[in-house]
Amino acid sequence: MPSALVLVHDAVPGRGEREVGTVGPALAELGFDVLVTAFQPGAPPVPDPGDVDVIVVMGSADAAYDDTVPWLGAELDLLARAVGHGTPVLGICFGAQALARVLGGTVARAPRSERGFVALGSADPDVLERGTWMQFHDDAFTLPSGAQQLARNEVGLQAFVCGPHVAVQFHPEITPDAFAAWLDAWDEAGERAALEAAVDIPALVADIAARADVTEAACRRLVGRFCARAGVTAS
């Protein structure tokens, strides 16, 4: 059975697993043994990237360019070793930014935040289909040398592919429960009031629920194409 490492960035036990959304089930349906963990005290040990078949790096409230984040150095080192070993990495939002940084790109504050569902094209539908994807980010990244741009809009680069690695700025994994976990984290951090001043949270919650079936199917296809392209299957 192939193995998948899914890295989350929440210190609260159980909440990181909720934030994985549809990515975990998509990998399980493909026959992967899925380990969800984090560089956090009390989390299961993070395996060596050479001991797993694929790695998925999820989003984070922290910035991939903020070297004061306690666990960031360890995670960037793991991704660098994964790239060196040839272990395919799928980076989602923060994960895409971290992957871009490891591959030689840069990460910085975006010209503006993106919140909600955004329609994106694709330079290669065999990797990333054209569609409407949920965005929730403040940062942006540049295209690493040797990578192929998959999607871009007026805010910046939205997706790229580099060898077996795929990076997407948006959140294909989003579900009502995953977003509820985000809300819990924002409440705990005292950030929800500021977000509600900038975003119509009830409307976004309703939109996520209304699109849940379509979003889940699109995530399954994205994960399936990533694994197939990397040549990692249960068979």
PLM region descriptions:
Residues 41-45, 115-117, 141, 157-159:
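A short acidic, often aromatic-flanked loop/helix-cap motif at beta-alpha or helix-coil junctions
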Residues 3-7, 108, 122-235:
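Amide-donor transfer/coupling interface in amidating biosynthetic enzymes
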Residues 18, 97, 115, 142, ...:
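Short alpha-helical
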Residues 57-124:
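Cysteine-nucleophile active-site neighborhood
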Residues 50, 113, 145:
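Structured loop/turn residues at beta-strand edges in well-structured enzyme cores
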Residues 1-85, 196-235:
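N-terminal beta1-alpha1 cap of cysteine-dependent amidohydrolase-like domains
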Residues 16-17, 46, 66-68, 100-102, ...:
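Short glycine-/acidic-enriched loop or helix-start segments at secondary-structure transitions
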